[in-house]
């Protein structure tokens, strides 16, 4: 399967990287000088560009060399502002009927915000995903990756399955703002426990250890939390897991975890079902996950 990636920056690059991992051949058509990601975020570019073919073409001058490749493609991926790809001569109307053409956009097609400029942080803000965490910034670009890239991969794979049945491709559109809103749409109905997964519960937080490292503590289920309290020598805390005063319980847990270094806690919990783990460094994670 040939994927031709016309996109710029993270969402498309991440999506085509996922398709590469699934066995696709990926050819990136870049502007003269290369994808801007290479200069703005070279580490991201190196990670997401590995294994792909790259070809520099000036679509503004002549789209024909690109079209030669697009006509062979099973999938075309782009992230221009709506309408730009068509004006450049590489839009969905310029590829064969069998092609799955995916447009990653900020706000979708046809709405009032169709032409609005934006980036990951803007989309999360518009989606309501930052309302109870601002001004804290997410550690990774959630709209780009979860809503944009993975949303694109899902729609592309579904369109390819449909093509197997009908012989026809499709133009699939991803809105990073709408996709981000779906990630938090459960809040519209109200949580049974306010902010259960975003700090509202003491049994779903990050705690500092004696050596300045941190533990991810997430025993949401009572059976896991009860075992944790037994292991730390405070079994009476099990009955307080869902108390109204979560800050008091969190203070108790913080005091407990601050007494020993990270390695000690990891050794204690290693063979136990307690849903506790480290906040690993990037280097540690790379080693552990290799």
Task: Describe every region a protein language model picked out.
Residues 33, 105-108, 176-181, 211-213, ...:
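Glycine-rich beta-alpha junction loops
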Residues 290:
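Flexible, small-/acidic-enriched active-site or ligand-binding loops
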Residues 192-204:
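Active-site Gly/Thr loop motif
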Residues 203-284:
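Aromatic-enriched alpha-helical interface/lid elements that frame and gate functional surfaces
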Residues 1-165, 192:
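N-terminal helix-loop segment corresponding to the beta1-alpha1 unit
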Residues 118, 149-156, 168, 172, ...:
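Internal, well-ordered alpha-helical segments in soluble enzyme and binding-protein domains
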Residues 5, 78, 173-174, 217-218:
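Active-site-adjacent beta-strand anchor residues
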Residues 159-194:
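Substrate-binding/catalytic subdomain of NAD(P)-dependent oxidoreductase enzymes
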